[in-house]
């Protein structure tokens, strides 16, 4: 079967939820037996989000093959079974870098390099490559129609629709239909102007997803259909809902999936959304509530920890618990003390980079360890837990990470300077290397030690988890820390790197170098987060007893 393409754009304002809408449609089509993937095209000039500020851009989502991508790819993986890869996300910066590399290499035979055709051809080639072997590929274009940055992407998709045939392409446009309280009605004019903007660059939308805080009345949908030149059945009302996992059913109830299948002439069974119904039932009927403190350095923007937030909620679904997340700035722990941690059922310290707020995180780990509060450390959250244990239990009072103190006399965490790639080539990396090139990225195998809590939680000897870090546990000082009681419960495939640590004489104190949040989904959850939330409930019950 030839690949069919759905191009998703947004208009009027940003943050309408293009990624959620695209992922929700993909989940319905997947439930109909189709092989679906989703791509995100980001117009910004950065090569990838890897070095962008989490407080501006949100989290960096890491794929199985080690790509540092937009957080929307996390949404995609949480909604569909198909896994994302490097091919599923690219930016203007990546496109321009590749075109300039080809120009320097002489691939264009001295031609004058222009946006059309060279940039647009590169975009089209990547979209086609990313969709190979799929029944449907949904392509989301970041930003808002009318932005200067997105014009080459929209032009490339317009051309691609001509190249592959309009019968194999569908343009889906999200717009805002605001409700004006003083008028007592929704207004369609912003949608009409947004479609006019699209038409000016040669794109006629086939489907309009109309975002509003309420269901859009039938007469207003007819008006939108008339003035925007789309079938009435292709004007979809997408109101605000209490859970993003309700959106697949909302789209299916308006037969969007049927419209898509009819358009592409796809013969496939009706979608079975019973798994999503179960998710919504568990979400709506919790048997209790736990409060988990997330102590981080980017807490002013919760999207900086998007996958962690979602993984905690997924674990709540598994345990039939409502998870209340209390965000605490680790710098506040340094200035106001650990009193900010009082009353929590569990504590989580997520990943991060740089020295700011680190001592607050170390004090947080100490507080959790000494007060028998369930603790989950992720990436940096593991490293600071190790530093805390080394200082306060193992007697290594000068323990630190060379990331925070390069002259540290007891660097229990250090930079690995020699890395071996899949081909066996050794690459030297130092603190002077480009930031994007010094990471241990993507899925790595981890072996779990018999008799540990980690082995019990996972129920397996070997697991695969995703990494994003450049510093590791220093094996030279590790024996001293282990002799003081800390247990290494997970190691890398070659048994050389520490992946998981735990405190044996603590009810639940586990920290991992990898990022388990990237593989958690609402339908399946993740064993580490499920165990953590269950431990939070047990701790809560013990305090009430």
From Swiss-Prot:
ATP binds at residues 15-20, 72, 239-241. L-glutamine binds at residues 352, 380-383, 403, 470. Pfam families: CTP_synth_N, GATase. One of its GO terms (cellular component) is cytosol. Mg(2+) binds at residues 72, 140. Residues 1-266 are annotated as: Amidoligase domain. Pathway: Pyrimidine metabolism; CTP biosynthesis via de novo pathway; CTP from UDP: step 2/2. Transmembrane segments: none annotated. It comes from the Bacteria. Its EC number is 6.3.4.2. UTP binds at residues 14, 187-192, 223. NCBIfam families: PRK05380.1, PyrG. Homotetramer. CTPSs have evolved a hybrid strategy for distinguishing between UTP and CTP. The overlapping regions of the product feedback inhibitory and substrate sites recognize a common feature in both compounds, the triphosphate moiety. To differentiate isosteric substrate and product pyrimidine rings, an additional pocket far from the expected kinase/ligase catalytic site, specifically recognizes the cytosine and ribose portions of the product inhibitor. Catalyzes the ATP-dependent amination of UTP to CTP with either L-glutamine or ammonia as the source of nitrogen. Regulates intracellular CTP levels through interactions with the four ribonucleotide triphosphates. This is CTP synthase.
């Amino acid at each position: 079967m030839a690949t069919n393409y759905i191009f998703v754009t947004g208009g009027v304002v940003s943050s309408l939820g293009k990624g959620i809408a695209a992922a929700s449609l993909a989940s319905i089509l997947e439930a109909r037996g189709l092989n679906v993937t989703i791509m995100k095209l980001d117009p910004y000039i950065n090569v990838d989000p890897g070095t962008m500020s989490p407080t501006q851009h949100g989290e960096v989502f890491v794929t199985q093959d080690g790509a540092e991508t937009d957080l929307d790819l996390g949404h995609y993986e949480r909604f569909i079974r198909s896994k994302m890869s490097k091919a599923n996300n690219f930016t203007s910066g990546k496109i321009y870098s590749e075109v300039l590399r080809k120009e320097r290499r002489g691939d264009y035979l001295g031609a004058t390099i222009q946006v059309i055709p060279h940039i647009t051809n590169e975009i089209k080639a990547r979209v086609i490559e990313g969709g190979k072997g799929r029944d449907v590929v949904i392509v989301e274009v970041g930003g808002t129609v009318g932005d200067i940055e997105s014009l080459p992407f929209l032009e490339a998709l317009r051309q691609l629709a001509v190249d592959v045939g309009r019968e194999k392409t569908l343009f889906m446009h999200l717009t805002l239909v605001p409700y004006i309280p003083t008028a007592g009605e929704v207004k369609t004019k912003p949608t009409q102007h947004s479609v006019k903007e699209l038409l000016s660059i040669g794109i006629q939308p086939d489907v309009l997803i109309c975002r509003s805080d309420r269901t859009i009345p039938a007469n207003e949908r007819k008006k939108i259909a008339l003035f925007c030149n789309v079938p009435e059945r292709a004007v979809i009302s997408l109101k605000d809902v209490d859970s993003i996992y309700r959106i697949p059913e909302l789209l299916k109830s308006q037969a969007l999936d049927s419209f898509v299948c009819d358009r592409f002439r796809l013969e496939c069974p009706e979608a079975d959304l019973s798994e999503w119904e179960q998710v919504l039932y568990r979400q709506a009927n919790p048997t209790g509530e736990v409060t988990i403190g997330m102590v981080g350095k980017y807490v002013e923007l919760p999207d900086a920890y998007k996958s962690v937030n979602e993984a905690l909620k997924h674990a709540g679904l598994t345990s039939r618990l409502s998870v209340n997340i209390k965000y605490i700035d680790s710098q506040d722990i340094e200035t106001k003390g650990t009193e900010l941690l009082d009353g929590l059922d569990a504590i989580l310290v997520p990943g991060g980079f740089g020295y700011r707020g680190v001592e607050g995180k170390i004090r947080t780990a100490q507080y959790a360890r000494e007060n028998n509060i369930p603790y989950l450390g992720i990436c940096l959250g593991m490293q600071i837990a190790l530093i805390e244990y080394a200082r306060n239990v193992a007697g290594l009072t000068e323990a630190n990470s060379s990331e925070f103190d390069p002259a540290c006399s007891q660097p229990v965490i250090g930079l690995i300077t020699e890395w071996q790639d899949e081909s066996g080539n050794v690459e030297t990396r130092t603190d002077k290397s480009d930031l994007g090139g010094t990471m241990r990225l993507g899925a790595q195998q981890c072996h779990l030690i018999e008799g540990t809590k980690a082995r019990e939680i996972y129920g397996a000897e070997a697991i695969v988890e995703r990494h994003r870090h450049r510093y590791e546990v220093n094996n030279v000082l590790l024996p001293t820390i282990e002799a003081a009681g800390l247990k290494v419960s997970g190691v890398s495939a070659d048994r050389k790197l520490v992946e998981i640590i735990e405190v044996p004489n603590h009810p639940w104190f586990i920290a991992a170098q990898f990022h388990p949040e990237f593989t958690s989904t609402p339908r399946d959850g993740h064993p580490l987060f499920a165990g953590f939330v269950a431990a939070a409930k047990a701790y809560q019950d013990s305090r009430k007893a």
